[in-house]
């Protein structure tokens, strides 16, 4: 994901003296120009400021959706390495670390 940065009002004042006067005239109109809309935290298409998730939180969220809850498919690790007899230990559908720890 990409982190977008909002423009602060002080940042917009680094332009030349002729452009400051032009921005004041634009602000008096009823419609917001794309530059003015950006100051409010949105672009003209309506996209909001996106927050990047913390890696730790993302990892915890992924951990909750473990392969044990999926009934039809085993995890990617199991599909890649199909070793051993499938008939033995039928309760365990997956050989990933989480499932091995759960059933031992």
Curated annotation (Swiss-Prot):
This is Protamine-2. Proteolytic processing into mature chains is required for histone eviction during spermatogenesis. Transition proteins (TNP1 and TNP2) are required for processing. GO terms for cellular component: male germ cell nucleus; nucleosome; nucleus. Interacts with TDRP. GO terms for biological process: chromosome condensation; nucleus organization; spermatid development; spermatogenesis. Belongs to the protamine P2 family. Pfam families: Protamine_P2. The modification Phosphoserine is found at residues 8, 10, 33. Residues 33-44 have a biased composition (Basic and acidic residues). It comes from Rattus norvegicus (Rat). Residues 45-91 have a biased composition (Basic residues). Keywords: Chromosome, Developmental protein, Differentiation, DNA condensation, DNA-binding, Nucleosome core, Nucleus, Phosphoprotein, Spermatogenesis. It is found in: Nucleus; Chromosome. Protamines substitute for histones in the chromatin of sperm during the haploid phase of spermatogenesis. They compact sperm DNA into a highly condensed, stable and inactive complex. Residues 1-91 are annotated as: Disordered. Transmembrane segments: none annotated. One of its GO terms (molecular function) is DNA binding. Testis. InterPro entries: PRM2.
């Amino acid at each position: 994901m990409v982190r977008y940065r909002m423009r602060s009002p002080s940042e917009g004042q680094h332009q030349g003296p002729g452009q400051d006067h032009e921005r004041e005239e634009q602000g008096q109109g009823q419609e917001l120009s794309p530059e003015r809309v950006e100051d409010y935290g949105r672009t003209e298409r309506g996209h909001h400021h996106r927050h990047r998730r913390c890696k730790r939180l993302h990892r915890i969220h992924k951990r909750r959706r473990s392969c044990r809850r999926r009934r039809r498919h085993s995890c990617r690790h199991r599909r890649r390495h199909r070793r051993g007899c499938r008939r033995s230990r039928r309760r365990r559908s997956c050989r990933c670390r989480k499932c091995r720890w759960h059933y031992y």
